Curated annotation (Swiss-Prot):
InterPro entries to which the protein is assigned, alphabetical: Cyclic_Pdiesterase, Phosphoesterase_HXTX, RNA_CPDase
PANTHER family per the UniProt record, alphabetical: RNA 2',3'-CYCLIC PHOSPHODIESTERASE
Motif HXTX 1, residue range(s) on this chain: 40-43
Catalytic reactions on record: a 3'-end 2',3'-cyclophospho-ribonucleotide-RNA + H2O = a 3'-end 2'-phospho-ribonucleotide-RNA + H(+)
Annotated organism of origin: Pyrococcus furiosus (strain ATCC 43587 / DSM 3638 / JCM 8422 / Vc1)
Enzyme class: hydrolase
Role this protein plays: Hydrolyzes RNA 2',3'-cyclic phosphodiester to an RNA 2'-phosphomonoester. In vitro, ligates 5' and 3' half-tRNA molecules with 2',3'-cyclic phosphate and 5'-hydroxyl termini, respectively, to the product containing the 2'-5' phosphodiester linkage. Ligase activity requires GTP, but GTP hydrolysis is not required for the reaction, which is reversible. Ligase activity is weak compared to the phosphodiesterase activity.
Enzyme active site: 40, 125
Entry protein name: RNA 2',3'-cyclic phosphodiesterase
UniProt-listed Enzyme Commission number(s): 3.1.4.58
Record family assignment: Belongs to the 2H phosphoesterase superfamily. ThpR family.
Motif HXTX 2, residue range(s) on this chain: 125-128
Keywords, sorted A to Z: Hydrolase
Length: 184
């Protein structure tokens, strides 16, 4: 199964991100926007894993989750990968993400022991859409600039989730396989 490890975002943040997607729209570029219910912060993309690996990963995540406290983060601003001149992914930034960075690093280190490739530099973000092609580079840049410091609200990071991703012609369908609450 295709899987990843993620943090879920609140309903109010989802609403704000959908409004940003609507604002960006599709006039300046053909963008495949992420569905509202699929917004998340990826801690690690795993790719194809077996049931056995999933069980190993669950044990690791359970152990890691207990070490960190639930905490509030703020979702603010729009960024792009790889760079503003060549926009492929549009994302919302996450502020106050020091704990998330630590969690991601620990997951990365632990899973490297199981043979997963190490990620390197982690940027906490919520993907809004993937750009297929740009029709009006300047127009798109202007819209993204206007959202550069937009506040999308805050939410409490409560758990780490192991998610399964099933690719369909309509887009991916995510299913939570296991959820590990952070400590109070």
């Amino acid at each position: 199964m295709r899987a990843f490890i993620a943090i879920d975002v609140s309903e109010s943040v989802r609403d704000a991100l959908v409004r940003a997607q609507d604002y960006i729209g599709s006039k300046e570029a053909k963008i495949k926007f992420v569905e509202r219910e699929n917004f998340h912060i990826t801690l690690k993309f795993l790719g194809e894993i077996t049931e056995e690996q999933a069980e190993e990963i669950k044990k690791i995540l359970e152990k890691i989750a207990k070490k960190y406290k639930k905490h509030e983060v703020n979702v603010r601003g729009i960024g792009v990968f790889p760079n503003p001149n060549y926009v492929r992914v549009i994302w919302a930034g996450v502020e106050n993400d020091e704990i998330i960075k630590k969690i991601a690093k620990e997951i990365d280190d632990e899973l490297a022991k199981l043979g997963f490739k190490k990620e390197g530099n982690f940027v906490a973000h919520i993907t809004l859409g993937r750009v297929k092609f740009v029709k009006d580079k300047l127009g798109l840049a202007m819209k993204l600039k206007e959202l550069a410091n937009e506040d999308f609200g805050s939410f409490i990071v409560e758990a780490i989730e192991l998610k399964k991703s099933t690719l369909t012609p309509k887009g991916p369908i995510y299913e939570t396989l296991a959820r590990f609450e952070l400590s109070e």
